[in-house]
UniProtKB/Swiss-Prot annotation:
The gene is tig. It catalyses: [protein]-peptidylproline (omega=180) = [protein]-peptidylproline (omega=0). Involved in protein export. Acts as a chaperone by maintaining the newly synthesized protein in an open conformation. Functions as a peptidyl-prolyl cis-trans isomerase. Homodimer and monomer. In vivo most of the ribosomes are in complex with monomeric TF. Uncomplexed TF, however, is in a monomer-dimer equilibrium with approximately two thirds of TF existing in a dimeric state. It comes from Shigella boydii serotype 18 (strain CDC 3083-94 / BS512). This is Trigger factor. It comes from the Bacteria.
Length: 432
């Protein structure tokens, strides 16, 4: 076997291989012997068919199969010998085959980039320092009560957290526009659903009033014909409602799994959940900064084959989220996913190099801790832990999570990490 390797472009490679004629003939004869042992031909007992008849009937197809097998096996031998690491599936380009002559073919593919990590010491990471305070717990209890609130009609003026039912008609330069009209529209104030100024124009009014408000559509508004335009909305305020928050009764508290129904028990449960969320948020915040710094410090070429593969993964994930099938997924435009796919490949290659250079292996104690932390959010943590322990795929996934964490920690060990005090709400809003 003769082998030559050339670079086509960037990460592209072409391996040209020549297989000696005698190697081909030896392999063909060997395979014909195997065929002769199994074939049945009228007039001959099984395994007793003369070789010349076997060769006459099956020689062409056997030779084709043998060439395909030799091409594959010799390519594998060649990349092992040349220490080449292909990325993605190779493309075989067979040359012209002539009986009794050497056979030359080529294989085209991309290779993984050679990654030499740099700039780790210049990466800057800001680690949030946060405590869950009593005030944070109070705020979360208010949120829980608001989620369970009922609405009661009121006679007073509209306030910041009320709910209103309105008819409205919008116009620009005295002309109504598409999508600018609605009847019995229910609007919960303070959620930012409407354009700036709309809710402010309703506040202070009472049910039964009709009035006009002036607003300006944002420059980034989705409708091209309305961007930056001044508009008027004629409003008929039909109903105003205010929230009625439930009291922290034992019955209410038990809905959240606090069996004794006590306020103290609920506060303890809420605090525990908030601290778990906080731990995850801090970890994610630090991780995202470390990875962003790693990507910015290391500009690497990315094999197109890996990007294509990642795009297919993202397409299928998108289809699953929206109830589509695999055929529909593959029809989604690649432009929707290309940037995200490339970044995921880059991050994977860089973290892979961190793992390789630091000789990291998944820490089983960390894996156990991650599973326990995840399971603590469920009603029966022991059942979840046992389920994971019996599922190899889930355990492997969690080992990958642990290994990624260890890689990020290896980056942080060389980065410039500073601490900054912040609040629970500020951190959570950054995560949103």
């Amino acid at each position: 076997m003769q082998v030559s390797v050339e670079t086509t472009q960037g990460l592209g490679r072409r391996v040209t291989i020549t297989i000696a004629a005698d190697s081909i003939e030896t392999a063909v004869k060997s395979e014909l012997v195997n065929v002769a042992k199994k074939v049945r031909i009228d007039g001959f007992r099984k395994g007793k068919v003369p070789m010349n008849i076997v060769a006459q009937r099956y020689g062409a197809s056997v030779r084709q199969d043998v060439l395909g097998d030799l091409m594959s096996r010799n390519f594998i031998d060649a990349i092992i010998k040349e220490k080449i690491n292909p990325a993605g599936a190779p493309t075989y380009v067979p040359g012209e085959y002539k009986l009794g002559e050497d056979f030359t073919y080529s294989v085209e593919f991309e290779v993984y980039p050679e990654v030499e990590l740099q700039g780790l010491e210049a990466i800057e990471v800001e680690k949030p320092i946060v405590e869950v305070t009593d005030a944070d717990v109070d705020g979360m209890l208010d949120t829980l009560r608001k989620q369970q609130a009922t609405w009661k009609e009121k006679d007073g003026a509209v306030e910041a957290e009320d709910r209103v039912t309105i008819d409205f008609t919008g116009s620009v330069d005295s002309e109504e526009f598409e999508g600018g009209k609605a009847s019995d529209f229910v609007l919960a104030m303070g959620q930012g659903r409407m354009i700036p100024g709309f809710e402010d124009g309703i506040k202070g009014h009472k049910a039964g009033e009709e009035f006009t408000i002036d607003v300006t559509f944002p420059e980034e508004y989705h409708a091209e014909n309305l961007k930056g335009k001044a508009a008027k909305f004629a409003i008929n305020l039909k109903k105003v409602e205010e929230r009625e928050l439930p009291e922290l009764t034992a019955e209410f508290i038990k809905r959240f799994g606090v069996e004794d129904g006590s306020v103290e028990g609920l506060r303890a449960e809420v605090r525990k959940n908030m601290e778990r969320e906080l731990k995850s948020a801090i970890r994610n915040r630090v991780k995202s900064q470390a990875i962003e710094g790693l990507v910015k410090a290391n500009d690497i070429d990315v094999p197109a084959a890996l990007i294509d593969s990642e795009i297919d993964v993202l397409r299928r994930q998108a289809a699953q989220r929206f109830g589509g099938n695999e055929k529909q997924a593959l029809e989604l435009p690649r432009e929707l996913f290309e940037e995200q796919a490339k970044r995921r490949v880059v991050v994977g290659l860089l973290l892979g190099e961190v793992i390789r250079t630091n000789e990291l292996k998944a820490d089983e104690e960390r894996v156990k801790g991650l599973i326990e932390e995840m399971a603590s959010a469920y009603e029966d943590p022991k059942e979840v832990i046992e389920f994971y322990s019996k599922n190899k795929e889930l355990m492997d996934n969690m080992r990958n999570v642990a290994l990624e964490e260890q890689a990020v920690e290896a980056v942080l060990a060389k980065a410039k990490v500073t601490e900054k005090e912040t609040t629970f709400n500020e951190l959570m809003n950054q995560q949103a």
